[in-house]
Amino acid sequence: MRTTHVVILPYDPKWNEDFSAIRAELEAAMGELALRIEHVRSTSVEGMSSKPCIDVDVVIPDRTCLKATIERLASIGYVHEGNLRIEGREAFCYTGKPHLQLHHLYVCPADSEELRRHITFREFLR
């Protein structure tokens, strides 16, 4: 289902807490496969208005880890959607996570240009 409108809210400090809860669940499932888990886009920028959706990048060593990553994320309710025509990142959707804030989850190899773009954009906004 696609939304027909966009909601922008004033900055909410809870977004960082929400990210921490999402990160904890991902870290528990991913273990050593996740080099790091990044909070990206506008909800990660203190004081910035944003859509109330947390954007998360899970960084893996390289594409050879993708199959194991997909399996581990599937074990906690995420479904791999492919790259959605954007090279350098893999998208995941989920159902049944009412305990977590609405979020977008992407998996990126450490050398991914898309990851670099996400981090650069976040740092520019900060």
Regions found by a protein language model. Give the residues of each.
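Helical scaffold of the NTase/Pol beta-like nucleotidyltransferase catalytic core
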Residues: M1-E38
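Catalytic cores of NTP-dependent nucleotidyl/adenyl transfer enzymes across multiple folds
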Residues: E114-R126
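Active-site nucleotide-donor binding segment shared across nucleotidyl transfer reactions
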Residues: L26-K67
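Short amphipathic alpha-helical segments
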Residues: T4-V6, P52-V56, Q101-H103, F121
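Short amphipathic alpha-helices in soluble, non-transmembrane regions
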Residues: A68-I76
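Short glycine-aromatic motifs
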Residues: A34, G77-Y78
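Conserved catalytic core of two-metal-ion nucleotidyltransferases
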Residues: Y78-E113
